């Protein structure tokens, strides 16, 4: 706007004339007057909250009026804006946000009202970014300063500032449109999702809805399966695993439904295409192209110029209005011209509903005589501009000469909405179109930030990468360090969780929420031999506890089917419920059709570990009482079906397999064998399940006799075994693996995510795990590398964990060969198996938090596996078991200050941090010991200072 801007701030000064450092007595204040401003923004009051200054609060309004009088007396007659101070807290400086909110801000508002001066609410503007965009709890960093500047600009000019990419650890950004789907940016509200490619001439936006599932409920129960069980077990007892496996292939498999497609698959919703026209600028070369995803707001942008026109596109999925929004605008009136259409590769039709409204509708193949899942996606357009022309035919909507346009899309399926899915989608769209869409975007940001801003991490920024796009940073990361890329990855993981699931919806599947085809890899289902569990590893520690609830609901729905599968496959004596290695929205619990991978029967036990984990963080006894019957039912299955193996008399699962892995029997036969009894992972899961059920029964004061029976059974389980070469054994016998670098490392479940093995409690087993991991190697699929990050973090080896993280971020393809995908990470930070699988992202997110904070062994462990290159950093809002929240600042690899906010468990302890000589708890020295016990009430904050 061609204004000269002057900043006449002086740090630590007060508005109060009686304060310790009065601003109006400084030379900077006189310089501000001499500047003869046309516009003045006054932001004072933060330092007036200090005790020595707040005692003079009776004169605060008088001093503010005096300051205003001095500016109004100037010959320039400036417009004056009063700013509300930003959120600030710093105990040792005496700065108190409670006084700012309840004392200083009301005074400023009173003066503004008395003098009819406008107020700029910087406190509200910065509150979502406190403390993550602050240097020290009082002073904002450069990104916080940018938000203040944007807020001032908007309030003074009445215009939205031109958006630009933000923080390097909260922004994915690119300087060209996406060339393939794995370069597009994911958005979602927990049910609806979209992925725009940012195309300039033709733009492709893939639409998603979490319940777009083909298939239907079906009977997979094989009535003859349990008849073969005694013979299968006899063969296993005699070491004839090959014969047992062959028998299972013919008998211990699910019954095939009459029509084979009932299992179904998660599918895309559809495609939205925009064909943009640029009029006289059609031949102008696009310039200043940027597209990015702002994790701090949950919004994506595309910006570029053509000729003298600057174009801005904004993409957001609103949770409150339950719609997808695309906002197109330009700085020159009448510059928005496009044609929009909807389509789907199969089983989709398009029709005009009304002027400015198109519907994509259809049904997904049930594979049976049951009703298909039906869906409706309805797009509506509203425009602004005096010369706007808008027309709708049966296939498209055309907009010409608009100043700005909003595309609003709603979608519903009969799976979640029932028979009213179509009318409900139309109602939601109409309600959204009637609303103030700018306010809808603001509401969407606040709704998202209510979750996202609970926690975050900061790691050292490298100025050398500030100008690099995200894909360039990924490539550079293999040769040169970039710690803030790990912070970006962690923040992105939390973003993906918030975007892909919410209470009342479905849990994220193998694709999370996002798919670009009707036939997703592995059906886009819920693999229960690690994948759906890995999806949820970071949820609790990332302070997103309620995002567990869709998984809890899924498990509840599986129980009746699991009870039927238990009796059909394991005999009438089988109690409780069972789940094998995969499931879907149709409650599939039977074994897989190939026993080599489908015989694993501990999927339910592993999911119960997550049910228990949610209790450990929440402490909700009503929740525990609700899920206890599920956990008990899972334990009853194993208690009633496990058998004594003949060699040691141990209780084992049989038949089963170690997930997807195989071995060779002794001798010359090189037939890969998967079917076995009592693999290490099964025993770890059963031991954990029994232990958790016992603990839950004690808490709930129920089933004492059954708990005692489980305790006795625990004593009959096989112990962990170490091979002659020092590895943790994967099977009861020290078999030779068919692939020593196999992607699954299932027998280390007890190290992570379980807690039966640790460096402190079981050092010999921990060392065996270390040797096992070295033998397995650091390569593997994307999600396998992610799991190994967690293993090494649990072993306390931060540098090795970080090495695995860098391996996880290996570029999935090169510019020279973009269609050949390998393991690693795509340009949009999606994990590549290959192909894309979302579990690797959340496994990596979990691994980063495990490097910074652990609590699985009954104590808080700060920086348990800190890499050398993360010497300085901070995190806030991370949760530990017991419900406490931890904020931490560290320098030179050692913690400096930790603030702990109490949860449901009051008595906690912390491991004495490595390299620390003295610890102060609320200014009182702690006794030097291996652990620091302390008490903190729920909601109470205590501070540790480390020296």
List where the protein language model places each region.
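Conserved SGNH/GDSL esterase-like catalytic core that processes O-acyl groups on lipids
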Residues: 1-65, 91, 99
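Solvent-exposed loop/turn segments at secondary-structure junctions
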Residues: 10-16, 46-51, 86-90, 125-128, ...
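Active-site segments of SGNH/GDSL-like serine hydrolases
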Residues: 43-49, 69-103
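Catalytic His-Asp segment of secreted/periplasmic serine-dependent ester chemistry enzymes
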Residues: 86-162
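Aromatic-residue-lined binding/catalytic grooves and analogous aromatic/hydrophobic interfacial grooves
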Residues: 163-595, 602, 613-615, 635, ...
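Well-ordered alpha-helical segments within folded domains of soluble proteins
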Residues: 530-540, 601-612, 681-691, 746-755, ...
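Non-catalytic carbohydrate-binding regions of carbohydrate-active enzymes
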Residues: 613-614, 618, 622, 634-644, ...
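Acidic/histidine-rich catalytic neighborhood
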Residues: 633, 637-696
């Amino acid at each position: 706007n061609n204004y000269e801007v002057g900043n006449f701030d002086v740090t630590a000064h007060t508005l109060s004339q009686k304060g310790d450092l009065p601003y109006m007595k400084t030379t900077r204040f006189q310089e501000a007057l001499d500047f003869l401003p046309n516009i003045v923004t006054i932001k004072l009051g933060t330092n007036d909250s200090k005790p020595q200054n707040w005692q003079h609060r009776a004169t605060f309004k008088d001093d503010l009026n005096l300051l205003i009088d001095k500016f109004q007396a100037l010959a320039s007659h400036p417009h004056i804006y009063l700013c509300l101070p930003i959120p600030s807290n710093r105990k040792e400086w005496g700065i108190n946000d409670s006084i700012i909110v309840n004392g200083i801000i009301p005074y400023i508002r009173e003066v503004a009202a008395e003098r009819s001066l406008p107020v700029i609410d910087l406190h509200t503007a910065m509150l979502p970014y406190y403390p993550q965009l602050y240097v020290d709890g009082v002073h904002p960093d450069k990104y916080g300063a940018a938000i203040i500047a944007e807020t001032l600009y908007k309030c003074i000019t009445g215009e939205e500032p031109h958006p630009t990419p933000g923080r390097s650890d909260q922004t994915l950004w690119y300087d060209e449109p996406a060339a393939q789907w794995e370069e597009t940016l994911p958005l979602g509200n927990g049910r609806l999702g979209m992925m725009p490619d940012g195309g300039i001439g033709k733009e492709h936006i893939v639409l998603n809805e979490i319940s777009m599932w083909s298939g239907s409920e079906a009977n997979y129960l094989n009535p003859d399966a349990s008849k073969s069980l005694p013979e299968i077990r006899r063969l296993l007892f005699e070491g004839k695993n090959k014969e047992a496996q062959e028998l299972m292939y013919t008998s211990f498999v699910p019954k095939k439904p009459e029509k084979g497609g009932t299992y179904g698959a998660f599918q895309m919703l559809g495609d939205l295409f925009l064909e943009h026209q640029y009029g006289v600028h059609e031949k102008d070369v696009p310039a200043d192209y940027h597209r990015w995803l702002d994790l701090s707001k949950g919004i994506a942008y595309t910006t570029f110029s053509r000729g003298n026109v600057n174009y801005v596109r904004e993409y957001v999925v609103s949770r409150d209005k339950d719609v997808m929004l695309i906002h197109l605008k330009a700085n020159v009136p009448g510059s928005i011209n496009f044609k929009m259409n909807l389509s789907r590769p199969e089983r989709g039709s398009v029709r005009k509903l009304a002027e400015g409204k198109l519907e994509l509708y259809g049904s997904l193949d049930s594979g049976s005589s049951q009703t298909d899942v039906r869906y409706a996606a309805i797009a509506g357009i509203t425009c602004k501009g005096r010369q706007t022309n808008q027309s709708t035919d049966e296939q498209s909507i055309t907009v010409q000469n608009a100043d700005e346009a909003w595309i609003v899309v709603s979608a519903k399926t009969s799976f979640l909405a029932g028979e009213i899915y179509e009318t409900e989608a139309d109602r939601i769209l109409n309600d959204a179109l009637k609303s103030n869409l700018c306010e809808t975007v603001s509401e969407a940001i606040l709704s998202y930030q209510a979750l996202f801003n609970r926690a975050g991490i900061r790691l050292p920024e490298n100025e050398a990468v500030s100008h690099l796009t995200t894909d360039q940073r990924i490539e550079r990361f293999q040769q040169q360090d970039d710690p803030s890329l790990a912070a970006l990855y962690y923040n992105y993981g939390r973003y993906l969780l918030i975007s892909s699931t919410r209470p009342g919806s479905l849990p994220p599947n193998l694709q999370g929420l996002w798919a670009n085809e009707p036939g997703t890899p592995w059906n886009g289902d819920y693999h229960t031999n690690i994948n759906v569990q890995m999806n949820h590893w970071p949820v609790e520690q990332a302070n997103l506890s309620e995002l567990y609830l869709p998984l809890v609901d899924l498990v509840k729905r599986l129980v009746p089917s699991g009870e039927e599968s238990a009796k059909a496959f394991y005999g009438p004596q089988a109690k409780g419920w069972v789940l094998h290695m995969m499931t879907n929205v149709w409650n599939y619990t039977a074994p897989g059709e190939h026993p080599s991978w489908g015989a694993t029967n501990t999927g339910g036990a592993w999911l119960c570990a997550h049910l228990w984990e949610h209790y450990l963080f929440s402490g909700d006894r009503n929740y525990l009482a609700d899920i206890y019957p599920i956990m008990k039912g899972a334990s009853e299955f194993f208690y009633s079906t496990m058998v004594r193996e003949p060699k040691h008399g141990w209780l084992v699962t049989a038949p089963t397999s170690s997930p997807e892995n195989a071995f060779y029997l002794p001798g010359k036969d090189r037939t890969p064998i998967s079917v076995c009894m009592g693999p290490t992972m099964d025993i770890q899961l059963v031991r954990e399940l029994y232990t958790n059920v016992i603990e839950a029964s004690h808490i709930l004061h129920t089933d004492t006799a059954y708990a005692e029976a489980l305790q006795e059974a625990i004593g009959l389980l096989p112990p962990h075994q170490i091979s002659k070469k020092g590895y943790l054994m994967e099977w009861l016998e020290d078999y030779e693996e068919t692939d020593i670098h196999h992607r699954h490392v299932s027998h280390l479940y007890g190290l992570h995510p379980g807690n039966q093995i640790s460096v402190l409690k079981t050092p010999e087993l921990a060392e065996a795990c270390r040797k096992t991991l070295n033998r397995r190697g650091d390569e593997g699929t994307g999600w396998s590398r992610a799991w190994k990050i967690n293993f090494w973090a649990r072993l306390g080896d931060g540098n090795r964990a970080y090495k695995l993280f860098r391996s996880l971020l290996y570029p999935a393809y090169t510019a020279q060969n973009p269609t050949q995908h390998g393991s690693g990470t795509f340009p949009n930070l999606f994990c590549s198996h290959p192909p894309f699988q979302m579990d690797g992202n959340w496994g990596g997110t979990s691994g980063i938090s495990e490097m910074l904070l652990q609590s699985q062994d009954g104590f808080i462990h700060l920086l348990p596996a800190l890499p050398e290159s993360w010497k300085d950093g901070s995190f806030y809002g991370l949760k530990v078991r017991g419900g406490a929240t931890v904020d931490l600042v560290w320098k030179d690899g050692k913690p400096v200050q930790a603030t702990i906010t109490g949860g449901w468990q009051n008595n906690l302890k912390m491991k004495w941090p490595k390299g620390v000589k003295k610890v102060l708890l609320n200014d009182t020295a702690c006794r030097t010991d291996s652990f620091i016990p302390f008490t903190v009430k729920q909601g109470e904050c205590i501070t540790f200072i480390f020296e």
